[in-house]
């Protein structure tokens, strides 16, 4: 079982990416949202958390931007009637923080809007999600997939501000990294944010 795969992003398809590590190319299935975020890192080193699904005729790797997202995926596919593709669809539509909010508000309609999930399945899913999802949130505050080279407080504050605006952690890291390159590591968060937003 793999914990994560770290290597060079060499190919992006409609539903998967290829990461080359020590001469081996790993095809990893991703959500559309994560695929979009990774496009800015073509031919760069990335780290993707993975979940393996092994069947008689295939071995599929599903990739995630954080350990928390992967554990959420594992929670989702533990429910009867929800397979890996449906689990990935849920995470594509609802980032972890939003999914926690949906569970807290018992918004069955939102979950039922995911292709492949009916109202009854959504109602059953909501009960367990409300109880178990909050335990995953501490994992959400971990390093981004592509660790930033800048560790100053303005950079970290900027990432937090962008995530509050709805950007993923990976996208926020990329935007702030580009803003720092354009200005400097000593720039304040007030100076960096306007430039970072232009990089979205």
Swiss-Prot record:
Residues 1-65 are annotated as: Domain I. Pfam families: HHH_5, RuvA_N. Residues 150-200 are annotated as: Domain III. Residues 145-149 are annotated as: Flexible linker. InterPro entries: DNA_helicase_Holl-junc_RuvA_I, Hlx-hairpin-Hlx_DNA-bd_motif, NA-bd_OB-fold, RuvA, RuvA_2-like, RuvA_C. SUPFAM superfamilies: Nucleic acid-binding proteins (SSF50249), RuvA domain 2-like (SSF47781). It is found in: Cytoplasm. Its main location: cytoplasm. CDD domains: UBA_RuvA_C. GO terms for cellular component: cytoplasm; Holliday junction helicase complex; Holliday junction resolvase complex. One of its GO terms (molecular function) is ATP binding. The keyword Nucleotidyltransferase does not apply. The keyword DNA repair applies. One of its GO terms (biological process) is DNA repair. Residues 66-144 are annotated as: Domain II. Keywords: Cytoplasm, DNA damage, DNA recombination, DNA repair, DNA-binding. Belongs to the RuvA family. The RuvA-RuvB-RuvC complex processes Holliday junction (HJ) DNA during genetic recombination and DNA repair, while the RuvA-RuvB complex plays an important role in the rescue of blocked DNA replication forks via replication fork reversal (RFR). RuvA specifically binds to HJ cruciform DNA, conferring on it an open structure. The RuvB hexamer acts as an ATP-dependent pump, pulling dsDNA into and through the RuvAB complex. HJ branch migration allows RuvC to scan DNA until it finds its consensus sequence, where it cleaves and resolves the cruciform DNA. Homotetramer. Forms an RuvA(8)-RuvB(12)-Holliday junction (HJ) complex. HJ DNA is sandwiched between 2 RuvA tetramers; dsDNA enters through RuvA and exits via RuvB. An RuvB hexamer assembles on each DNA strand where it exits the tetramer. Each RuvB hexamer is contacted by two RuvA subunits (via domain III) on 2 adjacent RuvB subunits; this complex drives branch migration. In the full resolvosome a probable DNA-RuvA(4)-RuvB(12)-RuvC(2) complex forms which resolves the HJ. Has three domains with a flexible linker between the domains II and III and assumes an 'L' shape. Domain III is highly mobile and contacts RuvB. This is Holliday junction branch migration complex subunit RuvA.
């Amino acid at each position: 079982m793999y914990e994560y795969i770290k290597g060079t992003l060499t190919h992006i398809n409609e539903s998967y990416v290829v990461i080359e590590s020590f001469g081996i190319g790993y095809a990893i299935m991703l959500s559309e949202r994560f695929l979009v975020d990774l496009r800015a890192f073509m031919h760069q080193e990335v780290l993707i958390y993975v979940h393996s699904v092994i069947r008689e005729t295939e071995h599929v790797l599903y990739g995630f931007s954080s350990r928390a997202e992967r554990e959420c995926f594992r929670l989702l596919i533990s429910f009867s009637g929800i397979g890996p593709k449906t689990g990935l669809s849920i995470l594509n539509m609802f980032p972890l923080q939003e999914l926690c909010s949906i569970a807290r508000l018992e918004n069955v309609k939102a979950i039922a809007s995911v292709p492949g999930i009916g109202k009854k399945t959504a109602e059953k899913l909501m009960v367990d999600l409300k109880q178990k999802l909050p335990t995953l949130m501490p994992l959400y505050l971990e390093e981004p997939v592509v660790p930033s080279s800048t560790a100053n407080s303005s950079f970290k504050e900027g990432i937090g501000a962008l995530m509050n605006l709805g950007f993923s952690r990976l996208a926020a890291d990329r935007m702030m990294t580009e803003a720092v390159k354009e200005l400097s590591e000593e720039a304040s968060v007030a100076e960096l944010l306007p430039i970072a937003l232009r990089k979205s």
